[in-house]
Amino acid sequence: YVGNIRYNTTPSTALQINANDIARLFRKYTSGEALQYLTLTSVPATGSLYYNYYNTSKYGSAQMPLTASTAGNVVFSYSPASASEYDLSELTYIPSGSNYCTSLGFTGYSSNGTTVSATILISVTASPVSEVYSVTTKGTSVNFPANSVYSAVASATGFGLSSIQLLELPASKAGVLYSGSYAADVTTAYSYGDGTGSMSQLRFIPNSGFTGSVSIPYVALNSSGTAIGSGVVSIGVVDSVKKFTDISTSTWCYKYVTELASANVISGY
């Protein structure tokens, strides 16, 4: 599974693709170039993708399903200049079913011909997969919260995961995520349980001078290796972990309070 851009939705909720997310990714991968237009290279295998789903756009056409045979023929403009152009902000995904991941691929172009090919991963679960948060002090390793990830996925999908696949690794400036004594990767399925190659063997070692927040997105896999949802583990690397009397680690804002307190912005909730 690949997810350069990631979205989560529920079975009954239409998902609008955010054109600005694609533009930001394009700038990141091209060191600052602007996205002009894109073409789709694949469409979701599950669910339906539409252009102008709500029939409110003045650009392009009326509501139009985008299928494997038609999607590649349409050019979507980031900033359409005429009514005949198709507006990139008018892509809408309609889920079908629950507890799965699907994707759409695209190639973006700048005005001078620079291209970026990437994938949008869409997770559809009965309820959103909660973010899992851990905190550590700078230079101190922290174990991957395997049990919390399992619980978050089970709560959202009603099913237990068998393994996870990481979608992105921490930036080198932040530190290294290890599996045992080796650097982790984005192709291995790390099993839930103990032993070599398991989630419990994952640990993040921040660089000695780094403080900040690290996000580790993942897809949860069932016993067949099929994705049942995606989520994210966030690790706060702080100068010191302060104790609070007005919130606990399960409070929704604990992540933000912890990191702001470490930066001496606040002293509690």
Which residue stretches match the model-derived regions?
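N-terminal propeptides
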Residues: V238-Y269
